[in-house]
Amino acid sequence: PLHGRLTTELKDATMQAFTTGEIDVLVSTTVIEVGVDVPNATVMVIMDADRFGVSQRGALREKAGENNPHLLIMTATPIPRTLHMSLMGVRDLSIIETPPEDRLAIQTYISPYDEATVTRAIEFELDRGGQVFFVHNRVQGIEGVADLIGQWCPGLRIGVAHGQMPGDMMEKILLQFIEGTLDILVATNIIESGLDIPNANTILINQAQNFGLSDLHQMRGRVGRSNLKAFCYLIVPPLFSLTQEARRRLQAIEQHSELGSGFQIALRDLDIRGAGNMLGGEQSGFITEIGLELFQKILDEAIRELRTTEYAELYADQPLDPPATEVLLDTDAPA
């Protein structure tokens, strides 16, 4: 492993071992972006690719030099630009829809921020021996939110975690929650990835209208990691006070709560935010200059030209045009 908490000596030793072939697989955080080259890498896997910008992903691949490694990008919810490129045939696309055994769909609700809603959700989870996440994404007010929850639900063991805490303190709080010595973890969105706590099966996301679809889907995925029914509450102000785009995001995440719904959520995100700039760095946004139809026509022509010239050998066994599909329906309707 290679991460920011390693000493310089240990980082250098790890990279030396990978360069000489003593290590076959190197697992790294984004610390690999700075001052590290991997010229002998033949395969690169980028997890949670929606957390990276276009330039970051390009820079990671360039670290392999002229080796041009195979690149596998993995994400629960592809960003609009990446998804659009896959749908257009620029990149190959594989979808994993089969969930782990015994998993159940997460029940998702849009709810107001009031004492009755919060206490009912928390008490239900604690009564069945579980634990609760409460997400509040403003560090300045997070202690006050934890105090308010303590007033509404007295006697509970509540911990607070956010990115501005010292690393050892945050690690201590997270370990206490994992070990079950805390009932509720009030945290910012730092919990949206990397936590697998089967006993935590209720999450309340405060001010959910301020999050993107990918963030909401990732945070909802912190619960429902066992064979118990899990619940996600999107805590928002009155819907009439929200923007149209915020309402569409909330409706999308509420409607697509079934297992394996990440791809459908990504499609809705593409519809809401637009496909972005395929020739630049913008990862979302609408085509306003030339229009979508003309842009798609130009893109199709460019792809066809590359597949018949520079990359002809690579696509020699694949047809230029997608196969036509004929569907016959047997009905009793009159002709």
Feature map (PLM): residue ranges:
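Post-DEXD/H (motif II) to motif III coupling segment of the RecA-like Helicase ATP-binding lobe
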Residues: R51-Q131
